Amino acid sequence: LLCGALVFLLPMFARIINAGNLLGLGLCLGGFLLWCFKTPLHQWYIAHGEQLWFRITSRTVLGLCLLGVLLAVGLTGGMLYGAYGKRTQNADVAIVLGCKVNGTRPSIMLQQRLDAAYAYWTEHPDCLLVVSGGKGSNEDISEAACMYQYLTEKGVPADRILQEDRSTSTRENLRFSKELLVEQGCMPKEIALVTNEFHQLRASMIAKDCGWTVSSIPAHTQPWLIPTYWVREWLGILHHTLLGTE
């Protein structure tokens, strides 16, 4: 439990606080409290274990816990398939989904996406890169401008990059990028999404909502960030599935 709590606490020292590490810490705290009060809980179970209401309640709680575990396993499997089961081999357009910019430089997560896009482009230099992301309230430049700057500094020719700088969500990333490609008269045979592996499944689900069938170019997430972002993505996928929103 202590190790689990540390795993979710570590990103907070880098000012990364989201539903993923908050839920993870909450589960660790719940487990710690159960361990602390295991003796009185056991005594309570002995005293009330044969009563009908207790049996119904305890079995319901255990059933919900089991359902949660199965759901987490299923979502993780789906996320892995979304990232690696649909990996592209020959996409002629790659859309790099934006992420936080620190000042004018990419955040850790955005740099990972850009490095994945660059690695793919070096093997497929005819591929057109679409960098998609608007300017957040705490960002000095748009995510698209930041990505364009990073990729051109690494040697990608400017004419192989299109900038979409209006979007504020994954859905807008895809919708505005599609409009930009149409404006440019580009009719790609295959479109791949460049984003972190945990985000590929939900991004492809949103793309399907927009009428696209896409493949993936997964960016690897640093190990110390995996628990926080994968747990957050479980919630994101459930939210999208149940409510149809991001």
Each model region followed by its residue ranges:
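Membrane-interfacial, low-structure loops and terminal tails that flank and connect transmembrane helices
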Residues: 43-56
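Internal/C-terminal transmembrane anchor helices
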Residues: 53-78
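Membrane-embedded alpha-helical segments of integral membrane proteins
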Residues: 1-46
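Structural signature of transmembrane alpha-helix termini at the membrane-water interface
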Residues: 10-13, 40, 70-77, 81, ...
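A transmembrane-helix-recognition feature enriched in membrane-embedded lipid enzymes
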Residues: 226-246
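Low-complexity, intrinsically disordered/propeptide-like segments
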Residues: 25, 183, 245-246
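A structural signal for short, hydrophobic/glycine-enriched beta-strand patches
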Residues: 74-232
